[in-house]
């Protein structure tokens, strides 16, 4: 049997990490929507402790931090299992390490977001990094699935028209999401009082 077909443990972990990341993004939106982003004034602790009283905005903000911390551990385990698996494709190992690097950089931006009191540039970068990581872990989930048997390098010229449209759509969605983050973090959501026109 193809060794790639047998190596499904890291695929399952990447799949779990994908849904975990989606949940974390949703939780992050709740934190912002409830005005809880600065409910914990310090980082990585909350009022000097890792176990604050989980009430009001502290509940959402600290829960967001705990779930994010669990994601770092989950993805690190997935990467380790992937390295130990029979699937030796270098691209998977490289991009897994890139994922860990993204999570570490993301942690720095989380700290800066709290310390600098939500500057919109850093908050938007925090959101953009989250979407980049979601993209990365989704791709890792796809290429480690039992259905994925492609081991050859593929470039953009070899993509079908449908695949090119998919890539373009992903880029546009990412751009729109980041732009939406800028609008939200700068408080410009209601600058235009009517839709689809603006004044």
Can you annotate each of these PLM segments?
Residues 2-199:
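Polytopic transmembrane helical bundles with strong interfacial aromatic enrichment
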């Amino acid at each position: 049997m193809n060794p790639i077909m047998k190596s499904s443990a890291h695929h399952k972990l990447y799949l779990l990490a994908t849904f975990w990341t989606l949940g974390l993004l949703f939780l992050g939106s709740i934190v912002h929507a409830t005005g809880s982003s600065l409910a914990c004034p310090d980082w990585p602790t909350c009022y000097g402790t890792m176990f604050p009283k989980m009430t009001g905005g502290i509940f959402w903000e600290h829960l967001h931090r705990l779930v994010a911390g669990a994601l770092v551990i989950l993805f690190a385990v997935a990467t380790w299992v992937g390295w130990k698996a029979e699937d030796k494709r270098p691209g998977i190992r490289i991009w897994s390490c890139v994922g860990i690097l993204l999570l570490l950089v993301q942690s720095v931006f989380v700290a800066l977001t709290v310390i600098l009191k939500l500057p919109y540039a850093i908050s938007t970068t925090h959101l953009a990094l989250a979407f980049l990581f979601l993209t990365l872990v989704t791709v890792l989930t796809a290429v480690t699935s039992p259905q994925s048997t492609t081991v050859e390098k593929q470039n953009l010229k070899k993509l079908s028209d449908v695949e090119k449209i998919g890539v373009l759509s992903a880029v546009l969605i990412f751009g729109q999401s980041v732009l939406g983050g800028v609008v939200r973090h700068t408080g410009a959501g209601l600058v235009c009082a009517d839709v689809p026109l603006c004044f």
